[in-house]
Amino acid sequence: MRCVILAAGASTRLGQPKALVDFEGMPLIQHLVERLESHGLEPVVVTRAEIVVDVLTALPDRTVVINSDPDAGRTGTLQCGLRQMLDTKGGEQAFRLLVVPVDRPGFSDETLTRLLDAQECCCPAKDGRGGHPLLLMPEDVGRIRSAAPDTPLRELCSPTRFEVEDENLHLNIDTPDDLGESDV
């Protein structure tokens, strides 16, 4: 399984790069990468050029890719990560992919394990509302690779939702107030 962390958003409402906010004593991007690595994943991080030096400082010896057109949309950011994977992983074309938005760190280790074991496109849900991370199957990855960069992901895949008890599943770090709500 492959993994990509989407960290190329403009963070306009937050007023600072989401990937670099302090989260449990370290940059949020470092927190997420270390959690994913503890489950055997080697995430590719896709970010903006303006913060790449800071991201690389937080993540030495990790794979970090610059999205040269981050305003084109989330699918375009995901495509940047996919290109990196296809260029460096021996040309393997079919793989499952875990997609982790940097601003959605509220999933539990149990939820992550369920995603890693899943054999269908899926995402966790709490109280009937879908959350993140998102697990894509090879056919979903193929559709994303050939889509326009501004195509909404919801038009390219239809994840099955599985209910979880993660108290912070819907934590979405978009504003300074959201940082105060994080109790992960």
Model-derived regions: residue spans:
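Glycine- and other small-residue-rich loops at beta-strand/loop junctions that grip anionic moieties
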Residues: 100, 133, 171
